[in-house]
A protein has these predicted regions:
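Glycine-rich phosphate/pyrophosphate-binding loop and the adjoining helix
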Residues: 10, 85-150
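Short, flexible, mixed-charge acidic loops at enzyme active sites
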Residues: 1
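Helix-loop-strand module that forms the ligand-binding subsite of alpha/beta enzymes
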Residues: 4-93
Length: 150
């Protein structure tokens, strides 16, 4: 039911997000990291978003940003399973700091964020140029799918 009609709660933030996300050209999701994983809040939210509406993200660029050092890359898994284009940078898309002032002092992390922004802009321009030339995304073969048990 969720994949056909969206989430069943009419006032659900997932439905509101998906309505806006359908119109977006690309996405950057950010999260703090706890125990080497994204926060449970964003992971639960994105589980529901991508399970109910993953088809709306196909062939669009996405990136995730983690506030930590060397952890939190699980958000990138959503991009692969929905045929998104994963945008990278010059290092893992992470910055370290307990608050905005601390993060601003992470020179390598801030450099990585700037490069991520430049790369995202470039990918979006490439996609637009492809559309102007008549290029269309490939159609996925979905003839063989394993259920959640196997």
């Amino acid at each position: 039911q969720c994949t056909e009609n969206g989430c069943i709660f009419s006032d659900d933030a997932v439905n509101a997000f998906v309505a806006k996300a359908k119109e977006a050209d690309g996405y950057i999701f950010g999260t703090p990291v706890y125990y080497a994983h994204p926060s449970g809040r964003i992971q639960s939210f994105l589980d529901r978003v991508f399970y109910s509406s993953g088809k709306h993200f196909a062939h669009k660029p996405g990136a995730s940003v983690a506030v930590a050092r060397r952890g939190g890359t699980a958000l990138n898994k959503y991009f692969g399973i929905t045929q998104m284009i994963t945008v990278g940078s010059t290092y893992w898309n992470q910055v370290h700091g307990r608050n905005a002032e601390d993060a601003a002092k992470d020179l390598e992390g801030m450099q990585t964020m700037r490069n991520l922004g430049h790369n995202m802009a470039w990918v979006l321009k490439c996609l637009e140029a492809g559309k102007e030339k008549g290029l269309v995304p490939p159609t996925a073969d979905r003839s063989n799918q394993t259920n959640f048990i196997r």
